[in-house]
Structures are given as structure tokens and as C-alpha cells.
């Protein structure tokens, strides 16, 4: 999907190619969402017998969505590392990318720690294992007005 996102931003892309690519991106996003929600279902089963502390709190995102964010961050790190070493780029470009790479790696360390802490807090009853479903509508023939109107005609 990462490369699809690069291609779709090409000003010279033909409309028909862009439409095909947009559908591939939507399909890929839906598959990713389904996988993330399946991982969260695993965590729900794993932690369902945890006795919550009286002052247990919720989190803004579930473990699986945090892991999804981590996977995107790792992709950014990979591509930023490529850019920071690209010999056809200017020295200034490589320097800026190297600085961004340092920031991305720090964010990765912080996010890994936060995910570990979240899972530990859930396992010890300090955080409530709660999932916020994405409820994607654009691929659903019953929820997307364009799709359900098309099926009526």
C-alpha cells in the first residue's frame, strides 16, 4: 500500500489508472483494518478474565491500533533511511532526512515503550481492554449511498 500511495500522488497519473489504484488502496485499507480488529479480538479474549482495579482507566486506542501505528512508523523509518543515504540526492536533502530519521527512531522507541506499558497495565487491571471499532463505511454496500443506490437501479 505504501507504494500505491506514492503512485497515486503522481500528477501525471491517468484518471483510469488512478481509479484502479484508489480501489486497491481502499481494499488494502479494509484488509488492514480487518487484521487489526482481529488482533484486538485476540487481546479481548486474552484479557477477559482480568479483574479491574477500582481506578482502572481507558486508553485512547487499543493495543492493535497502536501496533498498527508502529508498523506505519517502521515503514517511514525504512524509507527515510533510504532517502538519507540516497547518493543522487543533495547533501542538504540527505542531512534533513538524517535529522528526521533521528526523530522517527525516537518516536519508535517511545511508541514501543507505550505499547509495552499499555499491555502490562491491561494485564494488571490498571487499564480497561476496550476496542473502538472503525466502522468503515466506504466499502459496505449497505452503508455507502452510491453503492446501495446503484444496487437498487
Regions found by a protein language model. Give the residues of each.
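Anionic, Ser/Thr-rich low-complexity intrinsically disordered regions
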Residues: 1-153
